[in-house]
Amino acid sequence: MSFRLFARPLIQMPKLAAPRCINITPIRPISASAISLKTNTSTSTKENVHDLETFFKLIGRDCIEHLDAFESDLQKFLKTSSKDMKNMGIDVSTRRYMLRWIHKFQNDLEPLREHKRGKKKNGGERNAKTVLAKRTALKRLEEKERFESQELEAERKGEREF
């Protein structure tokens, strides 16, 4: 007895004629508007911000605290380097945030707005497993203690006999 690995199909499919011309038209037109080419329509742009206090209020994150360090002068702020900001006593995360906004403001890349700080979930990516494990262990322990207290209460009332 022999088995055929490749059986012929029961119904032969008709062969279609090859197309004589190939029409290659895109389904939808390609957009040429990149993010960098779009115009900035916001009111908080380079043309509308003339003082440092307004700038700091728009970018948020309590940068207004450092207004005195720059003597409320926008041009002085825009020319300040990271090293100078460090010498002024501005912490690293705020300093980097300000420097990013200086770059975006000078090149008119983005309207001024506050970027919220990220919030860690479950202690951050590295510690997530241990934090979740501790949390579930504490839940189990609380459940166990609650069950034991209920059992003791039931035994005291005489509902359980051991």
Swiss-Prot record:
Segment annotated as transit peptide: 1-37
- Which parts of this chain are annotated as the region Disordered? 112-135
Lineage, top-rank taxon, reads Eukaryota
| Gene that this polypeptide is encoded by | FYV4
Ranked from the top, the taxonomy reads:
Eukaryota, Fungi, Dikarya, Ascomycota, Saccharomycotina
Species of origin = Debaryomyces hansenii (strain ATCC 36239 / CBS 767 / BCRC 21394 / JCM 1990 / NBRC 0083 / IGC 2968)
Q: Name one GO cellular component term.
A: ribosome
What is the protein named? Small ribosomal subunit protein mS41
Q: Where in the cell is it found?
A: Mitochondrion
Q: What is its main location?
A: mitochondrion
